[in-house]
Amino acid sequence: MDALKSAGRAIIRSPSIAKQSWGGGKHKKLPENWTDTRETLLEGMLFHLKYLGMTLVEQPKGEELSATAVKRIVATAKASGKKLQKVILKVSPRGIILYDSTSNQLIENVSIYRISYCTADKMHDKVFAYIAQSQQNETLECHAFLCTKRKMAQAVTLTVAQAFKVAFEFWQVSRDKTEKREKSGSGGEGASSSQSDGSSSITSLKASASANLLDLEDCTKAFDVLNASDNHIEDLFRQNASNENNNIVWELDDGLDEAFARLAESRTNPQVLDIGLTANDLQSEECLSPSSWDKLELNPAEADELFMF
């Protein structure tokens, strides 16, 4: 945990990145500087959605599993006849935080380490859904949200996957440092080896990150640009940590550590979050630029169609 905290303290928030212009158009292909959103992710990216509901599932991941769950959630939402709750979804390497749009009241806070799957549903293509382990009883829950457009659902999915990747980097650095500290013991030997331990941790992390950047199942080719971020985690440790008031402090308790390790065993690749998007999905559709994700405007016809699922 100490290593994770020190990593967090080394991160200086970058509001200038969050305000960066990505171009005037709203519907653009995934930008070449997609990896720049990592800095924005540290502060949290906001999405304005409508909450459809939740249902329990038996497995932590799977396209067919999530599709069945979403179908059940949508049917229940339709049958209720109630107006969907407008929510703000905040995505960061910490996890997903859900707020009520009207009252700004906190609805739910889900650690990224408890999330096992997310997707843009193919049948209900405006729906984003994720599966996470409950904090109360460790059951698996599928939560679904109605987005303004299909591109929005895809954008949220990609953002959660990217947030997971950044969180995994912190988690692995923390684990590596803890293991090496335990092996080296205390005293002069431990002190003299701390610098080399940190260096080897970074080297090991860079090697795994280079090989597994946002695998997105068979979507690797669509995200080759992410290989440019191999050195990002090393850069984090070079940052000046003097501005304590602006730094993010990370904490990972034993319960979360255990949950993350357990869910990792169920993944196609333990180091990446399984998502229900393929390279064809991304290449056949234009993606929203990051600055436009929460600003998509609808024409009257689209607004009427929004509640038709």
Swiss-Prot record:
Q: Which domain of life is it from?
A: Eukaryota
**Keyword terms of this UniProt record:** Atherosclerosis, Cholesterol metabolism, Cytoplasm, Endocytosis, Hyperlipidemia, Lipid metabolism, Steroid metabolism, Sterol metabolism
Q: In which tissues is it expressed?
A: Expressed at high level during oogenesis and embryogenesis. Found in the oocyte vegetal cortex. Found at low level in the adult liver and spleen. Found at very low level in testis and heart.
What's any GO biological process attached to this entry? endocytosis
Keyword Lipid metabolism attached? yes
Q: Give the species.
A: Xenopus laevis
Motif [DE]-X(1,2)-F-X-X-[FL]-X-X-X-R motif is found at 258-267
The region called Disordered is annotated at: 179-199
Spell out the residue ranges making up region: AP-2 complex binding.
Answer: 250-277
Supply one GO CC term from the record. Answer: early endosome
Q: Where is this motif: Clathrin box?
A: 213-217
One short Pfam family name for this protein? PID
- Which residues belong to any copy of the PID domain? 41-195
Report the subcellular localization: Cytoplasm
Q: InterPro entries, from UniProt?
A: Adapter_Engulfment-Domain, PH-like_dom_sf, PTB/PI_dom
Complexes and interactors:
Interacts (via PID domain) with ldlr (via NPXY motif). Binds to soluble clathrin trimers and to the adapter protein complex 2 (AP-2, beta 2 subunit). Binds to phosphoinositides, which regulate clathrin bud assembly at the cell surface. Interacts with the VLDL receptor (vldlr). Interacts with the vitellogenin receptor.
**Name this polypeptide is given:** Low density lipoprotein receptor adapter protein 1-A
